[in-house]
């Protein structure tokens, strides 16, 4: 080891000690981490409208707090973004204006006027009606009609006949489906209908209600629809205006009270506690703290969060993990990360929970070798049903389709758990899909984060985890990351050229370290330096607005930043110690075969 390496390790050791201490201080008594999502003006406006329509008296205290949040977070340009102190968006601005105009038209008259002026700058009513410019056009237009700011000309009907679709198509709407069912019931009740339409409405109403009832049963008394205040608000509004199921409406109102944030606002979804605990636990294991009782408690919590029932709403089998409790939907990303964390605790597929989680991933693999988030996509179920809700197909913007990050998490889990040895045909199919979607310059898109860095770094890490660090796809990923490193040493294309973020820098570094790049090279050394230097006074990192929730709504998640950055620095330290090899107990578990690093598919 050179003097330079020793100096570098000393600095990394100190940084990791400070960061792990800070994270342990945030660990909850049950072993998990909260995973705080940013407050969303758009989600807050949606919830306010729901409470105002359903129970304005009983929810008066919550409504007042939410209105105060919107009033103090309006931007200097009159708009609202998807988060506070971020660039205004048409979705965030129009939703906030609608809530203020509906609930406090006199008290907030000046703010409404400024907000509507910002909507006009986005293109006004014409832009609101255009699903290409306003991704939440169905919601936004309707709320502005309720508030008296737009006419109902061009108002889109949400067709209740979605409840009659064959299950493979209905499942592809994934977490849009609860909104579709409730708003379909509302449209059936409120909008004019001829004889044929009335017959369709009568036929579709019972299965639509049964769908919502079933989800309430899955959620239990404390859950929300899709574990989301925003989706729960949509269900509450639809059923309230349809005059149906006041019991489900009360269920939603109870959920709003349970999920309000200290600042008086709501996030697009409940906090991502499973994500947070998975990410941080894996980071602690990479640091070398896997035997620490606090990490062992986190692993036990992850085990307890595994779902034991079929999830009929997406067709998923038992054995998966969702993003939060009690009712996050099982999905490929959380399941892959949970399997990785349990495997990092020293367990392979001989462990029943690891085996079930890995089998869940295999059962959910798409026909083309990829993975989507929630639902498996088969050869015959390729139609995009979202056109029925917005008047045209929006395949690039819906989230049921394959995702590089989700696929990468699944591949890593299957390899590190020992479920799929090198050369397994399921991994070969995944590799071929990565090769298919990789751009000629080596970058790879994904659906759940902005930009290409997240997809490219995640795929590189996954390929290295299954012994394909020397494959053509991996080499092109490395080349792309080399060419796109920013001048400050970080990575990031999500927020614009040259704007490095913690999440993207960490994901790039994870891929490079897993692939075994030379730690003495400037590229990984500068990336690690950027991460160390960009911690806050609390030794943790600040998240960026690059997570994609649904139809272009964005969010920030504190422990996506902290967990991935911790993993990246720990894996870089291991790379330095081993002189550029990645053969560690965690990076290459003893139960997996050691493949030829130069092998290609």
Map each language-model feature to its residues.
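Preference for long, amphipathic alpha-helical scaffolds in soluble/luminal domains
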Residues: 1-601
